[in-house]
Amino acid sequence: MRKNIVAGNWKMNKNLQEGIALAKELNEALAADKPNCDVVICTPFIHLASVTPIVDKAVIGVGAENCADKVSGAYTGEVSAEMVASTGAEYVILGHSERRAYYHETVEILEEKVKLALANNLKPIFCIGEVLEEREANKQNEVVAAQLASVFSLSAEDFSKIILAYEPVWAIGTGKTATAEQAQEIHAFIRSLIADKYGKEVADNTSILYGGSCKPSNAKELFANPDVDGGLIGGAALKVVDFKGIIDAFK
């Protein structure tokens, strides 16, 4: 059976000391009130080796926000999947809309990143989603289908290790909001694509997270949908009270 997951994406926020403090505070809150879902925090690279040992791995998984598409070598500024795994991190976000937009990550680059993450026993949280122009042109289905090419080259066994996150890029920071119905509609479509490629059992066991503007106030409604298995949380993951409010939507 697929897992319900709430994953926090800290993005480029929190210096090292602030990140350690946030991880400790979250760890204490969840130790006192155990979650009914898997909880993951994906932090900047510099936090990983410090945050991983201070959280209870039975309650909180730790991940990176990216990794390189190369194994090792003369790639100044890059951090490999092997390096991420060596910190004790278990997860890595790949294909986030910000990486696609600002760093021009292609289907081919992301395919390499996914393979290297899996080779180092990391669990990829693979992001897909359409921008405003694509949504207004009603092209969201073909956009996410094209983006899934980065992971649809995998064997069924390897694909089963992937967590998907749908980001309605058009609804993030634009003042427009995606309804719970819109979220369910596209999540169901994504699951149907997985079923067509890998069969119903694999599709039924794939967690698909919602990466829109998820808050404590709307999480319960979003997560009540049959094909929404949790959230990839940005801003609300930077405050324990907000992040825990979203986690508690599964109670």
From Swiss-Prot:
Protein name: Triosephosphate isomerase
Native source species: Phocaeicola vulgatus (strain ATCC 8482 / DSM 1447 / JCM 5826 / CCUG 4940 / NBRC 14291 / NCTC 11154) (Bacteroides vulgatus)
Alphabetical list of HAMAP family matching this protein: TIM_B
Intrachain S-S bonds: none
GO biological process terms on file: gluconeogenesis; glyceraldehyde-3-phosphate biosynthetic process; glycerol catabolic process; glycolytic process
Job of this protein: Involved in the gluconeogenesis. Catalyzes stereospecifically the conversion of dihydroxyacetone phosphate (DHAP) to D-glyceraldehyde-3-phosphate (G3P).
Broad EC category: isomerase
EC number: 5.3.1.1
The entry's keywords: Cytoplasm, Gluconeogenesis, Glycolysis, Isomerase
Pfam families on file: TIM (PF00121)
Protein family membership: Belongs to the triosephosphate isomerase family.
Quaternary structure and partners: Homodimer.
Lineage start: Bacteria, Pseudomonadati, Bacteroidota, Bacteroidia, Bacteroidales
Active site: 96 (electrophile), 167 (proton acceptor)
CDD domains reported for this sequence: TIM
Gene Ontology annotations for the cellular component aspect, listed alphabetically: cytosol
PANTHER family assigned to the protein according to its UniProt record, in alphabetical order: TRIOSEPHOSPHATE ISOMERASE
Keyword Membrane: no
Annotated binding of substrate, by residue: 9-11, 173, 213, 234-235
Keyword Cell membrane: no
GO molecular function annotation: triose-phosphate isomerase activity
Catalytic activity: D-glyceraldehyde 3-phosphate = dihydroxyacetone phosphate
Cellular localisation: Cytoplasm
Taxonomic superkingdom: Bacteria
InterPro entries in UniProt: Aldolase_TIM, TIM_sf, TrioseP_Isoase_bac/euk, Triosephosphate_isomerase, Triosephosphate_isomerase_AS
